[in-house]
Amino acid sequence: MPELPEVETIVRDIRPAIIGKMISGLVMRPKAQSNLMNVDAQTFYENTMTQIVTTVIRKGKYIIIPLDNDAVIVMHLGMTGKILIKEVPDVSFDERFTSDNFVDRHTHFLMELTDPSGEDEDIELHFNDVRLFGHIWLIPQLDDIENIPIKGLAELGPDALGITIQEFSHIMRTRASIKSVLLDQRKIAGVGNIYADEACFSAGIHPTRKGGSLSKEERVKLWLAVKTVLKEGLKYRGSSVSDYTDASGNAGSFQEHHKVYQKTGQQCVDCDSQIKKIKLSGRSTHFCPSCQSEGE
C-alpha cells in the first residue's frame, strides 16, 4: 500500500499539472463503481464537470482535490491504486478506451482537464487500480476543508511529518506494541508497514516493545527516526516494492535503501546478525535481533 512518501510524491507531481484546470471530460468504466464510495457516477459527473481544480492536498494517505464550486474529490489508493498524468492522445474521447495503448484496462476512472486560458495543453488524470481496493469519494458541498465527513479521514491523527515530540510522546503512553501504534492512522497519519519497520531499525528499538516502555531518550530517537525515514522515502520518490509508481509511471527507488524491510535472512547492514521476520498485529515485521533493543 502506498504510504506517506508515495502519496506525497504523487501529490507533488499532480499539483502543478491540474491546479487551475477545468474538468472537461469524465469517464467511469463499470468497475469504477467498486471505487466510488458514496455517490453514483451520474452524481459525480453532475458535481464535477466544468469545475476548476483549486488545489491538491494530502492528509495522511488521502489525496484531496477541492473544486471551485465547493465540491471536493477525495482519493485513497488502497493496495494497488495509481494516479497517472498523461497527455491527451490525438483520438476521440471514446476511442481512447478501445485499446490499452491509450487507456490501460485497469484504469477505471479518467478525467480530462483543460486550461481555461488555452495556454497549457490538455491533460488526463487516470485512476488505475488492479485490485479495486482504492476509494474515491465526492463531497458535493463542503464549507470547511479541515472537516471532511469521511470516517477514516476525520479520525486521522497528527501527520507523521508534522507531529511534535509532545504529541508523539503522548501516543506512545500505551501498552500496545510500538509497531501497532505507528500503523494506527488514528494515532499518527501516514506511516505504513515499510516505514514503521525502517524507523524502528533506525532508532535501534524492537518493534514488539510496548510504547509505554520507551524512555524519554528512546521516544526522541524514534520520533526523529520516523521523520528521517519518511523524508528519505520522499527524496527517493517512494518505495516500489509492488505496484507503486509516481504520476509519470516511474518507479521510486527507496527500496534500494531499505535496511530491514523484506530483507529476511540477509545480513544486517550494521552487524553480523540476520534480519528476522515475524507477524505482529497481522503484519509482516522485519528487524535485526541484535541491533534493536527489546528493553529490560
Positions of PLM-derived features:
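Gly/Gly-Pro- and Ser/Thr-rich, intrinsically disordered tail segments characteristic of DNA damage-repair
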Residues: 1-134
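Short, contiguous clusters of charged residues that form electrostatic/catalytic patches at enzyme active sites
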Residues: 5, 9, 166, 224
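Generic detection of long, well-ordered alpha-helical segments
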Residues: 1-4, 101, 162, 215-223
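Phosphate/anion-contacting hairpin/loop surfaces
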Residues: 73-190, 195-202, 210
